[in-house]
Amino acid sequence: MTNKIRVRYAPSPTGLLHIGNARTALFNYLYARHHGGDFIIRIEDTDRKRHVEDGERSQLENLRWLGMDWDESPETHENYRQSERLALYKKYIDQLLAEGKAYKSYVTEEELAAERERQEAAGETPRYINEFLGMSADEKAAYIAKRQAAGIVPTVRLKVNEAGIYKWHDMVKGDIEFEGGNIGGDWVIQKKDGYPTYNFAVVVDDHDMQISHVIRGDDHIANTPKQLMVYEALGWEAPAFAHMTLIINSETGKKLSKRDTNTLQFIEDYRQKGYLPEAVFNFIALLGWNPGGENEIFSRQELIELFDENRLSKSPAAFDQKKLDWMNNEYIKNADFDTIFALAKPYLESAGRLTDKAKKLVELYQPQMKSIDEIVPLTDLFFEEFPELSEEEKEFMAGETVPIVLQAFKAKLEAMSDEDFKSENIFPQIKAVQKETGIKGKNLFMPIRIAVSGEMHGPELPDTIFLLGKEKSIQHLEDMLEKLK
């Protein structure tokens, strides 16, 4: 095996890029880049039933969107898809058959299901029982001939050393070991369709591509002893393994499930909503790893420099949507305005809001946006009917000084010339109302904000009033005063 660090991300093209898979890719990427190694993309497409058209393109496109690059992939190298490597798998399966380390199995799915049912009914752990057990050579030959005559296509099974101990030092979990007798018996390495099973193909691929470290989710721990059996059978050195902890939903404490439709879990979803790739990259990098300290905002280059596999967490990583929203807002607030406006334009255009005020609106709401698509609901005030007040807003507007403030401020706006109606001239008018009425603070600003915008929170009030326009602002004040009578 090479001394150079070589890691891989090996997705199945079965759909969109899930945030858990994105984390696997990202940690492999950070590990390779930190150590000056190679990051490889390999496509594991042996499960033809689950193959999704365009699945590979979607995976690579979303990895690129996140800002990752790679050194080797199906785009630049031949035979980096498992479906292109069948001859290589056959070579090693034939070798194991010739050496007596594997054999052809003619047991049917129906027979396996019946045996499994019997074992469960008897309270036994389900396992494959060697179909040739107790047969003489002649009986075995007759059995095979009969099965072949019936048109039964065999699988190929690896012989399991039931007394063997399969152990490794996991970079995250520490020492782990499995007994060969607990694996479930001889297992299939080649299916009836001639395709290898995952646990066989992945070993051949990792060895052939000289992968030095396998970094993946801890749902693969149970696969590792089977893979170690293949390494042993073929006389190869196994790579180092690191199994990252699972990702849980911070609200439920349960494993993040693709079936949980209340949580956005696919990178494509975040792209469509206008999350910034730098923010999503930063957020995912902290799912099960942190560099220490209080800071949580890091550039891609900083994360590469800081990445330390010894700080991979042993506890589940909590997926917190609110934290991602906070982080994305931090990136949006600090981004160049022209960048944010360019990202916001398609959303405004789709909503029919790409007016001459568009730039000012994006500038006004840039500090508030948790995702770029929020520019549409945030600007409803300027394009839709006045919103229905919440109970909290209604309660506040029931205050006895509210009509006094609104009447005084309406008079101030009416007295302003169109030429003077600018953001910088509106705040002094509010202060003038304070001086005249003696009402200040929340009791001054909140009635004006609610009357003009229908909300208790928002961007700078003078900017909102200016963009709303003099006529519309006065109309909103009059309407509110009428409601308060």
UniProtKB/Swiss-Prot annotation:
A motif ('HIGH' region) lies at residues 11-21. It is found in: Cytoplasm. GO terms for molecular function: ATP binding; glutamate-tRNA ligase activity; tRNA binding; zinc ion binding. PROSITE patterns: AA_TRNA_LIGASE_I. GO terms for biological process: glutamyl-tRNA aminoacylation. One of its GO terms (cellular component) is cytosol. InterPro entries: aa-tRNA-synth_I_cd-bd, aa-tRNA-synth_I_codon-bd_sub2, aa-tRNA-synth_I_CS, aa_tRNA-synth_I_cd-bd_sf, Glu-tRNA-ligase_bac/mito, Glu/Gln-tRNA-synth, Glu/Gln-tRNA-synth_Ib_cat-dom, GluQ/Sye. Disulfide bonds: none annotated. It is an enzyme of class 6 (ligase). Gene3D superfamilies: 1.10.10.350, HUPs. It catalyses: tRNA(Glu) + L-glutamate + ATP = L-glutamyl-tRNA(Glu) + AMP + diphosphate. Keywords: Aminoacyl-tRNA synthetase, ATP-binding, Cytoplasm, Ligase, Nucleotide-binding, Protein biosynthesis. ATP binds at K258. A motif ('KMSKS' region) lies at residues 255-259. Its EC number is 6.1.1.17. Catalyzes the attachment of glutamate to tRNA(Glu) in a two-step reaction: glutamate is first activated by ATP to form Glu-AMP and then transferred to the acceptor end of tRNA(Glu). Monomer. Belongs to the class-I aminoacyl-tRNA synthetase family. Glutamate--tRNA ligase type 1 subfamily. This is Glutamate--tRNA ligase. It comes from Streptococcus mutans serotype c (strain ATCC 700610 / UA159).
